[in-house]
């Protein structure tokens, strides 16, 4: 066992003395040591309940004959960080979490690892750490929040974001927005639709790193406590069997994860995160792999924000095992932490609600929910969640309205300075330019709330999993490094064709070269972590990982 490095031999008497001060007994010195990375805090709704989940994991570890040691990691709530300077810190926190877990695992020589996490950057950060450390590991995701409810319909956080636009449009009063604000979020858990946190939980299960069914179980359901205990027991089995994350994160399992993502119509952020996880596993994964899978994987679940169904509906319909059941003929068989293969899990599943999880013969759409687009505006690629784009906007040509940053764009939107047909360009919001590649949920939600139907938005920043509408993000190269998006001027024609997977700037190359002669990136003064981050972060088409 790895942990023998700190507990065997007379030379380790000082190490053992410290362990004994924790209450570790002679008998326990001979057992596997399991690290439990718990991202609990009381500022993130998705993490508020993780203490109870971690406690059940610890009980499971002990029951299976190992010793649990809990440690903490940070976690940022993207919703609370949204729309201000705080959002610049969200994506960088992914790398911080991965590094922090690695530090604890390697310093203390744990034999196994359980990652207890829920929200947007915490799940991928812990996945990266688990694969990087490559000790037997299992992930327990905290589960979705129950939907809010008012006026006879289910609510989610996106209703509140879009309510801001409705107030600006005069179609909702501030009092009504206040009532919505108080009804939308009834308790702990990740935001209720197929936004980034829940998409990552589903992807983790499809990768084979969570027990079957874990992703969709609501945060407040006792089934979450049971699967947490089972996960604690199972990680001890993985230690004894010698099954490691890199045995599970393979080209086949990554393809399965992308298939599930496409079938669900998941968040565009999964492109960044899966590429980052693949890099830790030394598995080649590029943007074209997402298009290749999307073209042969039907979109079979019409989930919020593009559709009507919440994560609660997905859970009641059978969760990810039922989705795997419908995708069975599209899947590559691959092992999972459960000890059963992905096809065994699919064969044993049942679809309880065919309106929520459709067959591949009667899908929402014949192709997957994400597309990678390229063209003169995005030579190295960009990402669009086509599952949330009305088909009437799959082809669009319009004049650019250019904003150097989200704040200026938001002000113009709320003051109704945008015309139908415009293409909003929000730039200098990429990995280096933001820095931190902030999400543009506030402007996209404001556009929806104001009732704009034919306004597109393109950016080198990111979009929340809650974004809906014709929004293309992750444009690479970004403006800060001189990508074509830096050269766009007001009135330039931008051509979007999602059928052709293209995004073009209808400006002569010679004109762009003239503009480049006078282009300079905006000067800005950065300090602290962000100053270090911009020196090492890669472009979005490489997963925005740090070198």
Swiss-Prot record:
* Keywords linked to the UniProt accession: 2Fe-2S, Amino-acid biosynthesis, Branched-chain amino acid biosynthesis, Iron, Iron-sulfur, Lyase, Magnesium, Metal-binding
Task: List where this protein forms a coiled coil.
Answer: none
Q: Which PROSITE patterns match?
A: ILVD_EDD_1 (PS00886), ILVD_EDD_2 (PS00887)
Instruction: State which pathway it belongs to.
Output: Amino-acid biosynthesis; L-isoleucine biosynthesis; L-isoleucine from 2-oxobutanoate: step 3/4; Amino-acid biosynthesis; L-valine biosynthesis; L-valine from pyruvate: step 3/4
- Modified sites of kind N6-carboxylysine: 121
> Which GO-annotated molecular functions does the record name?
2 iron, 2 sulfur cluster binding; dihydroxy-acid dehydratase activity; magnesium ion binding
Q: What is its EC number?
A: 4.2.1.9
Q: How is the cofactor bound?
A: Binds 1 [2Fe-2S] cluster per subunit. This cluster acts as a Lewis acid cofactor.
Listed cofactors: [2Fe-2S] cluster; Mg(2+)
Can you list the disulfide-bonded cysteine pairs?
none
* Record-listed Mg(2+) binding positions: 78, 120-121, 439
- Give the annotated active site: 464 (proton acceptor)
Q: Report the catalytic activity.
A: (2R)-2,3-dihydroxy-3-methylbutanoate = 3-methyl-2-oxobutanoate + H2O; (2R,3R)-2,3-dihydroxy-3-methylpentanoate = (S)-3-methyl-2-oxopentanoate + H2O
The UniProt transmembrane annotation reads none
BP-aspect Gene Ontology terms:
isoleucine biosynthetic process; L-valine biosynthetic process
GO CC annotations on file:
cytosol
* InterPro entries, per the entry: Dihydro-acid_dehy_C, DihydroxyA_deHydtase, DiOHA_6PGluconate_deHydtase_CS, ILV_EDD_C, ILV_EDD_N, IlvD/EDD_N
Which parts of the sequence bind [2Fe-2S] cluster? 119, 191
Q: What does this protein do?
A: Functions in the biosynthesis of branched-chain amino acids. Catalyzes the dehydration of (2R,3R)-2,3-dihydroxy-3-methylpentanoate (2,3-dihydroxy-3-methylvalerate) into 2-oxo-3-methylpentanoate (2-oxo-3-methylvalerate) and of (2R)-2,3-dihydroxy-3-methylbutanoate (2,3-dihydroxyisovalerate) into 2-oxo-3-methylbutanoate (2-oxoisovalerate), the penultimate precursor to L-isoleucine and L-valine, respectively.
Q: How does it assemble?
A: Homodimer.
Query: Which family does this protein fall into?
Result: Belongs to the IlvD/Edd family.
The protein's matches in NCBIfam families, at most eight in alphabetical order, are given as: ilvD, PRK00911.1
Q: What is this protein called?
A: Dihydroxy-acid dehydratase
Per the UniProt record, the source organism is Methanoculleus marisnigri (strain ATCC 35101 / DSM 1498 / JR1)
What lineage does the source organism belong to? Archaea, Methanobacteriati, Methanobacteriota, Stenosarchaea group, Methanomicrobia
This protein's gene is called: ilvD
């Amino acid at each position: 066992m790895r942990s023998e490095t700190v507990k065997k031999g007379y030379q380790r008497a000082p190490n053992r003395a410290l362990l004994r001060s924790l209450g570790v007994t002679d008998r326990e010195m001979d057992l596997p040591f399991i690290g439990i990375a718990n991202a609990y805090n009381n500022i993130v709704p998705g993490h508020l309940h993780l203490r109870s989940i971690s406690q059940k994991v610890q009980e499971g570890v002990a029951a299976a004959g190992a010793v649990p040691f809990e440690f903490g990691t940070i976690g940022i709530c993207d919703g609370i960080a949204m729309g201000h300077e705080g959002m610049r810190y969200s994506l960088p926190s992914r790398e911080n979490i991965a590094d922090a877990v690695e530090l604890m695992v390697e310093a203390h020589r744990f034999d196994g690892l359980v990652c207890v996490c829920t929200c947007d950057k915490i799940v991928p950060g812990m996945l990266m750490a688990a694969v990087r450390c490559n000790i037997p590991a299992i992930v327990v995701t905290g589960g979705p929040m129950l939907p809010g409810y008012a006026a006879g319909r289910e609510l989610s956080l996106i209703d509140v974001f879009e309510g801001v636009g409705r107030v600006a449009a005069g179609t909702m009063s501030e009092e009504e927005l206040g009532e919505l604000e108080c009804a939308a979020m009834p308790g702990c858990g990740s935001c209720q639709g197929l936004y980034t946190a829940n998409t990552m939980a589903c992807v983790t299960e499809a990768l084979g790193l969570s027990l079957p069914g874990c992703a969709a179980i609501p945060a407040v359901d006792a089934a979450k406590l049971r699967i947490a205990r089972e996960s604690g027991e199972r990680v001890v089995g993985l230690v004894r069997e010698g099954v490691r994350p890199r045995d599970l994160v393979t080209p086949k399992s990554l393809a399965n994860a992308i298939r599930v993502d496409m079938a669900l119509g998941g968040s565009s952020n999964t492109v960044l995160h899966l590429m980052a996880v693949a890099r830790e596993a030394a598995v080649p994964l590029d943007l074209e792999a997402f298009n290749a899978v999307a073209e042969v994987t039907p979109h079979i679940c019409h989930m919020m924000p593009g559709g009507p169904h919440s994560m609660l509906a997905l859970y009641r319909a059978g969760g990810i095992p039922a989705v795997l059941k419908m995708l069975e003929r599209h899947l590559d068989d691959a092992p999972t932490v459960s000890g059963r293969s992905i096809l065994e899990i699919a064969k044993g599943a049942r679809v309880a609600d065919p309106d929520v999880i459709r067959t591949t013969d009667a899908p929402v759409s014949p192709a997957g929910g994400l597309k990678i687009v390229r063209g003169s505006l995005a030579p190295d690629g960009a990402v669009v969640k086509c599952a949330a784009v009305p088909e009437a906007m799959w082809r669009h040509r319009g004049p650019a309205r250019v904003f150097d940053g989200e704040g200026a764009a938001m002000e113009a939107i709320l003051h109704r300075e945008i015309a139908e047909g415009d293409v909003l360009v929000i730039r200098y919001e990429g990995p280096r330019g933001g820095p931190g590649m902030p999400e543009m949920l506030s402007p996209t939600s404001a556009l929806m709330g104001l009732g704009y139907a034919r306004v597109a938005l393109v950016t080198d920043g990111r979009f929340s999993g809650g974004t809906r509408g014709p929004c293309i993000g992750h444009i690479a190269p970004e403006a800060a490094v001189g990508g074509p998006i830096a050269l766009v001027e007001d009135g330039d024609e931008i051509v979007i064709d999602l059928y052709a997977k293209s995004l073009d700037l209808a400006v002569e190359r010679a004109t762009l070269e003239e503009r480049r002669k006078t282009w300079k990136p905006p000067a800005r003064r950065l300090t602290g972590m962000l100053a270090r981050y911009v020196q090492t972060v890669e472009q979005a088409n490489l997963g925005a990982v740090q070198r």
